[in-house]
A protein has these predicted regions:
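Glycine/GP-enriched mid-protein hinge/lid loop-to-helix segment characteristic of carbohydrate kinases
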Residues: 17-20, 26-29, 36, 92-94, ...
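Short glycine-rich, Thr/Ser-proximal phosphate-binding strand/loop in the N-terminal lobe
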Residues: 2-40, 44, 73
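Short glycine-aspartate micro-motif
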Residues: 3-7, 51-55, 100, 124-128
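Glycine-rich phosphate-binding loop and adjoining helix at the ATP-binding site
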Residues: 62-123
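Phosphate/pyrophosphate-binding loops at sites that engage ATP/ADP/AMP, CoA/4′-phosphopantetheine
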Residues: 18, 40-54, 61, 95-99, ...
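Short glycine-rich anion-binding loops that position phosphate/pyrophosphate groups of nucleotides
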Residues: 59-62, 130-132
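Conserved A3 ("GATE") glycine/threonine-rich loop of ANL adenylate-forming enzymes
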Residues: 11-12, 107, 131-133
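Glycine/Thr-rich phosphate-binding loops of Rossmann-like dinucleotide-binding domains
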Residues: 14, 64-66, 135
Length: 138
């Protein structure tokens, strides 16, 4: 099974294709620019790759509430051009596959809990230091 992943970071996007074992089969990164240019790079990477599902971890703030009318949006970010951008809408318009959306920190912590150093542990802490400092507790 081929799975797609996007780390939508404030300075760069990392896109990859992996499998259910957590193995990375293909990976690329590019600078975060205006949404149109950045998403063009995302689409260029994934088009024709026949991925079966896609996970997105994004810089924020975001709206991850499935019941919200702005689910899938990057909301009140100071990042130029990205304020109230419907990133999941753009992806769903292009790809008819199951998708998940959360913060970049939650995505990274979930990856560590599922495939990384926290796999099999009852508890773990994930600390990220960037524009802000976030501590994630499992």
């Amino acid at each position: 099974m081929k799975l797609g992943a996007i780390e939508a970071g404030g300075t760069k996007f990392v896109v990859c294709i992996g499998n259910e074992k957590g193995e990375v089969l293909e990976r690329e990164s590019f600078p975060t620019e205006a949404p149109e240019k950045t998403m063009e790079n995302v689409f260029k990477f994934f088009d024709g790759k026949e991925i079966e599902a896609l996970g997105v971890g994004s810089f924020g703030p975001i709206d991850p509430d499935l019941t919200s009318p702005t689910y899938g949006y990057i909301t009140t970010t100071p990042k130029p051009g990205w304020n109230n951008y419907n990133i999941m809408g753009a992806l769903k318009e292009r790809y008819d596959i199951p998708m998940a959306f959360d913060t970049d920190v939650n995505g990274a912590a979930l990856g560590e809990a599922t495939f990384g150093v926290a796999k099999g542990l009852d508890s773990a802490l994930y600390l990220t230091i960037g524009t802000i400092i976030i501590l994630w507790v499992l």
